[in-house]
Regions:
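Domain-level signature for soluble enzymes in the chorismate/prephenate branch of the shikimate pathway
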Residues: 2-317
Length: 317
């Protein structure tokens, strides 16, 4: 067996190299077409914004024409190649959508429209008050989170449900909840609380306890997404939840995230009880180092209609 050697056919390799070059030429042509489409779209968005429309309304108008496009496959293909050709076409479709999102943001900024992450979320000034269930680990998390406030106020809750209700009723601005147990696994009970109450993660910090061996993570949560400042060397996270019925949309989203310079940090499958029964969901956490998620948020708004932002946050390690 040791004498067996694999020697690929040089003609096959040369032909594949030539086809790669041709594919590169075609890809650049796609980029040029996408550039013109993005230029036209950015002009339309500029006009809509000047007429008082919001960014969501403007992007939704464009989305109606772009999101349902079906990848085309030539008619003379061999039947046995259809499945692989479909995969290639889907990959090109994901590339097109990510590239269009990038080019659209570039076109808007060239027109003086400084679109950023904050434009995609509700603006709300919240009380500088924080509720949590008193214990050593939660108090350690409070010491970290409270540094972001000028005059933080503390309110103890009897249990996690009360802490959540205090936020939902507006009696306090934020709550502190345990998020991950030792080893990094998400606490399923907290994940369900976030889903049912529609709370957002504003910040995350590790806590270690008096002996230094607890190694859990706690989250600062509120009803609205809070966009943290960007600083050199900061890792920032965008957490999303999408319905698990469409696996193609999930795989396309992951491809787009990579194209737009973000890293897939974590993915979980979840099941939640709703009025329509138990439904599956994907939970994705995307990571960027000192970057932002504006291009990704444009992509999501245009092409992923059923996503939910769970938060943009830093891990305050």
């Amino acid at each position: 067996m040791s004498d067996i050697e694999f020697v690929p056919n040089k003609n096959n390799l040369a032909n594949l190299d030539e086809l790669s070059l041709l594919s590169s030429v075609l890809s650049e042509k796609r980029i040029c077409e996408l550039y013109e489409l993005a230029e036209f779209s950015s002009g339309l968005i500029e006009e809509m914004l000047s007429d008082g429309f919001g960014i969501y309304e403007a992007l939704s108008l464009i989305s109606q024409e772009l999101s349902d496009r079906v990848p085309q496959i030539h008619e003379n293909h061999l039947p046995e190649n259809l499945e692989m050709l479909t995969s290639y076409s889907k990959a090109f479709s994901a590339f097109d959508k990510a590239s269009f999102s990038k080019l659209l943001l570039k076109g808007l900024r060239l027109r003086g429209i400084s679109l950023s992450e904050k434009d995609f979320f509700e603006k709300e000034v919240r009380k500088e008050s924080i509720a949590y269930v008193k214990n050593q680990l939660a108090s350690e998390a409070y010491d970290v989170f409270s540094e972001a406030f000028s005059e933080p106020r503390l309110r103890y809750a009897n249990d996690l449900r009360e802490a959540v209700n205090l936020v939902l009723t507006g009696e306090v601005g934020y709550a502190i909840l345990p998020l991950e147990e030792k080893g990094g696994a998400r606490l399923s009970s907290i994940t369900e609380i976030l889903f049912n109450s529609e709370l957002k993660i504003n910040s995350v910090t590790p806590v270690f306890g008096a002996l230094g061996n607890a190694d859990m993570k706690y989250a600062l949560v509120s009803p609205t997404v809070s966009v943290p400042t960007r600083e050199i060397g900061d890792d920032r996270y965008l957490e999303l939840r999408i319905a698990g019925e469409n696996t193609h949309k999930f795989s396309e989203l992951v491809s787009a995230a990579e194209s737009l310079g973000t890293e897939l940090y974590r993915v979980n499958t979840l099941n939640f009880s709703t009025e329509d029964g138990t439904l599956p969901y994907f939970s994705l956490v995307l990571k960027t180092e000192a970057g932002d998620f504006t291009e990704m948020l444009i992509y999501l708004t245009l092409f992923v209609s059923d996503y939910t932002s769970v938060g943009i946050y830093k891990n305050l390690e």
